[in-house]
Amino acid sequence: MGVVTQIYDTPAAVPPTRLFKAMTLDFHNLFPKLVDSIHSIVFTQGNGGPGTIKKITTIEGDKTKYVLHRVDAIDEANFVYNFSITEGTALADTLEKVSFESQLVEAPNGGSIRKVSVQFFTKGDATLSEEELTANKAKIQGLVKLVEGYLLANPDY
């Protein structure tokens, strides 16, 4: 098994408290409304704390896929949320799992910076192409920007 790590920051024009609520605490309610391909997010174990498992079901075209999202750590006071994608039909065959460590910090402009470390645990000698890594980074940063846009348009959320 190999491990490939990506580290990057994504700025957002909303404070950490609002972004953390939307991207972490209310993720299961908000993302199916914002992301067309997400059909549902269901708790299969736990209540949101470490050890909780959420089943995320997506529909793309005529294909239904899912992943299991396991909460590894959550620290509301410091805006930390760590989770792993551990299995599912939407997890690439070459991957054992994908782990995310994220923290929101306050930006000088009153917004946020989402600091993320992503670890891809590959099966056997499998590798990830630069295109796959670039696409993954764009997808994750795009989700932050999608939520940012929603929060800016809905200041009472």
Curated annotation (Swiss-Prot):
Underlying gene: PR10
Name of this protein: Pathogenesis-related protein 10
Alphabetically ordered keywords of this record: Pathogenesis-related protein, Plant defense
Disulfide bonds: none
Transport is among the record's keywords: no
GO molecular function annotation: abscisic acid binding; protein phosphatase inhibitor activity; RNA nuclease activity; signaling receptor activity
Gene3D superfamilies the UniProt entry points to: 3.30.530.20
Family named by the database record: Belongs to the BetVI family.
GO CC list: cytoplasm; nucleus
Tissues where the protein occurs: Highly expressed in leaves. Expressed in roots. Expressed at low levels in stems.
One of the GO biological process terms: defense response to fungus
Function: Involved in resistance against the pathogen Phytophtora sojae. Inhibits hyphal growth of Phytophtora sojae. Possesses ribonuclease activity in vitro.
Entry-linked PANTHER family: OS08G0374000 PROTEIN-RELATED, PATHOGENESIS-RELATED PROTEIN 10
InterPro entries on file: Bet_v_I/MLP, Bet_v_I_allergen, Plant_def-hormone_signal, START-like_dom_sf
